[in-house]
A protein has these predicted regions:
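Conserved pre-motif I regulatory segment
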Residues: 127-165
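Walker A/P-loop
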Residues: 158-181
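Interdomain hinge/linker at the junction between the two RecA-like core domains of SF2 helicases
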Residues: 229, 316-345
Length: 345
């Protein structure tokens, strides 16, 4: 301003907020009564959430499990809300600047159809590509079949948190995926998320899972070693990694831990994707010990408050039962004890 000598930033800092005008214009666009009802409903929901968290913490303490502090779970709820706010705001802003229509995401009806088709393809893959292979051997195949059937049966139950402890070579990837597909279809889950600690495991299993569901477009492989040849592919891939808006997500433990705990907005944005999902943690024993207590609490939140089902897979489960605090909530074994299968492998 040449007259006053003030910069634009200084003028903005000095300018009083015309609150009355802001309110008047805001309610010209939005219905005041409707907003008030939404706020009242949100307040009532918050009260119910607090009660639910309190009951969970008291119950776990009474059972001498000590599954964490209620403030942690409240913080997770706030993180999910912030995630939805960031995702909706960034998506809307991107479409506005690109002058594109804001598309609807995959509907419940569409995702159910995807799960049904994937199950059909998966069972065909098991029958023709796996069970009929001569090199598998009858005794080994019988054990793998038993493990797979147990996982299939558990998909019909109501348990939210499982351990799948079977020897290396017992087919835990396909068995856990079988559980995930049937559970996702039965309970109308939005995503299946497969998590592994090493990119080599991810790349290997991603190829097999794509073949198993017979539709590479519904599988996102998200880790630093993914290389794409075309610029359009890179652009589309980048968008998907920002939102995880795809039915089956295969990613690293680092990515998931960032989504759960990082302060970066790009990580927080994906937090809501972990809700209403089936999540498979492969080789869970590789998660660093210093992260284990926070990991336990995050799994508790996902399975007790976020409508997700979690499977912890390993040939040797980490010793996490004897922690003084921050334990996992009740966890069911998906199969028989590991000693039963070790002789076969």
């Amino acid at each position: 301003d040449f007259e006053s000598g003030c910069t634009l930033q200084e003028r903005r800092a000095e300018k009083e907020c015309q609150e009355d005008i802001v309110k008047e214009r805001f309610f010209q666009i939005f219905d005041k009564e409707k907003i008030q009802k939404v706020c009242e409903a949100a307040d009532a929901q918050y009260v119910q959430i607090n009660k639910k968290i309190g009951m969970f913490v008291r119950k776990s303490t009474k059972q001498n499990r000590h599954c964490g502090n209620g403030y942690f779970y409240i913080g997770m709820y706030f993180r999910v809300l912030l995630s939805m706010l960031l995702d909706s705001d960034w998506t809307d802003t991107e479409k506005f600047f690109q002058n594109e229509e804001l598309k609807q995401r995959i509907s419940k009806k569409e995702i159910q159809k995807i799960w049904q088709q994937s199950i059909q393809c998966f069972e065909n893959y098991l029958n023709h590509e796996i069970r009929n292979k001569a090199e598998n051997g009858q005794s080994l195949q019988a054990v793998r079949q038993e493990i797979s059937e147990r996982c299939y049966e558990e998909a019909e139950k109501e348990t939210r948190l499982y351990r799948l402890t079977v020897p290396t070579g017992a087919g835990k990837t396909l068995s856990s995926l079988r559980f995930a597909l049937y559970r996702a279809e039965r309970t109308q889950k939005q995503h299946i998320i497969y998590v592994a600690p090493f990119n080599s495991i991810l790349s290997q299993n991603a190829d097999e899972i794509r073949r198993a569901v017979d539709d590479p477009d519904i599988v996102l492989e998200h880790h630093c070693n993914v290389i794409l040849s075309e610029k359009k592919q890179e652009k589309d891939y980048k968008k998907l990694t920002e939102t995880w808006d795809v039915p089956i997500i295969m990613t690293s433990a680092v990515q998931v831990l960032n989504v759960l705990f990082s302060g970066q907005k790009r990580d927080i944005r994906r937090m809501h994707t972990l809700c209403n999902s089936v999540i498979i943690f492969d080789e869970v024993q590789a998660i660093p010990k210093k992260c284990m207590e926070l990991f336990n609490l995050a799994v508790n939140f996902l399975t007790n408050f976020a409508e997700s089902d979690v499977v912890l897979c390993s040939a040797t489960q980490p010793s996490i039962k004897d922690l003084k605090e921050n334990n996992l909530s009740e966890c069911m074994e998906m199969t028989e004890i590991i000693e039963k299968y070790e002789e076969a492998f």
